[in-house]
């Protein structure tokens, strides 16, 4: 088991003076979620692409390997530079391309083969599992609904692997082409097909998925309809959401900072979880984004981070809070991983 402890200097902590006639303000402090930052799927993707670059030279992921701008910039200095397509990568002189951690449809392998370039696959195995499950549901005759963001590369990849027009991405019922329950009739009524299966983008909020699924189920099951829900939200995403809930309940935080790239879906979900619990929550990429107005009435600040956020960025945010008079978490920020030491 590898334990990495990030120590945050206490320089800049404000001294609080009091006397017999003055009521001390409670100590301002930072608390951190038990689970935050890099997940094993992200670490695996970074390992693969950096190893490939080290062995064979420059490589172009089709998109961002992970959704974190600091990491993408560091990879660029190591010969890993994103491209929008295989054709673009070839035009810029790359002879190797990579599938990002979010996955791609089968067309990318075909394009790479046609262009005569090597293809390196960093797809998270949990995303691959969703892709295969989508294929299975379609083979079994289900209309596939992917709960997620239609623009997200993972969702696009799942629909591409389903290989059918009988698949759609949706985040709310109104995104679907149906507006009535099975068995209902009348002008303008569009009912679901008899069999509907649901999978989820791996980085979604489990509570929101269940609400969506229950509402859709009520539309499908009348008149002998079949509904199947496959909760494919990944364990690291769920762990980070549950850890944040525990932090809010245990430490009575006044403010939450969810750290991660602005493209990071799972970081956005963390901010949503905090706001849903009645705590002001902000999604930030860098410590420079912290606004003094946020801290005006915040005694306890909770910190969490998405699955693609490197340790040093978390450290920088906690350090910025320390410079504003917040006591860092006791013992630093503890990251425990049984089989991996982060590269960044």
Q: What feature does the model see in each segment?
A:
Residues 1-344:
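The feature marks the mature, well-folded catalytic cores of soluble enzymes
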């Amino acid at each position: 088991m590898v334990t990495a402890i990030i120590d945050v200097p206490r320089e800049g902590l404000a001294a609080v003076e009091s006397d017999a006639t003055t009521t001390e303000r409670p100590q301002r402090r930072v608390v951190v979620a038990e689970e935050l930052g890099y997940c094993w799927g992200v670490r695996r993707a970074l390992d693969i692409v950096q190893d490939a670059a080290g062995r064979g030279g420059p490589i172009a992921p089709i998109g961002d390997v992970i959704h974190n701008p600091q990491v993408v910039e560091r990879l660029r200095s190591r010969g890993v530079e994103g491209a929008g397509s295989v054709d673009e990568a070839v035009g810029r002189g790359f002879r190797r391309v990579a599938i990002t951690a979010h996955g791609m449809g089968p067309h990318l392998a075909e394009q790479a083969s046609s262009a005569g370039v090597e293809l390196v696959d960093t797809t998270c195995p949990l995303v691959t599992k969703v892709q295969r499950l989508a294929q299975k549901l379609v083979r079994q005759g289900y209309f596939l609904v992917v709960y997620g963001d239609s623009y997200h590369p993972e969702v696009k990849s799942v629909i591409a692997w389903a290989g059918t027009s009988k698949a759609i991405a949706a985040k709310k019922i109104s995104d679907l082409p149906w507006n009535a329950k099975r068995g209902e009739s009348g002008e303008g009524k569009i009912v679901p097909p008899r069999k509907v299966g649901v999978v989820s983008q791996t980085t979604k909020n489990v509570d929101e998925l269940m609400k969506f699924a229950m509402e859709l189920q009520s539309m499908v099951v009348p008149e002998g309809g079949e509904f199947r829900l496959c909760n494919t939200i990944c364990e690291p995403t769920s762990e980070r959401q549950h850890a944040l809930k525990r932090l809010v309940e245990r430490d009575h935080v006044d403010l939450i900072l969810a750290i991660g790239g602005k493209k990071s879906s799972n970081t956005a979900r963390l901010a949503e979880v905090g706001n849903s619990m009645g705590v002001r929550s902000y999604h930030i990429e860098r410590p420079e984004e912290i606004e003094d107005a946020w801290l005006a009435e915040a005694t306890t600040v909770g910190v969490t981070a998405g699955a693609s956020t490197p340790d040093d960025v978390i450290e920088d945010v906690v350090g910025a809070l320390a410079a504003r008079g917040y006591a860092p978490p006791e013992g630093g920020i503890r990251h425990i991983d049984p089989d991996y030491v982060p590269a960044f």
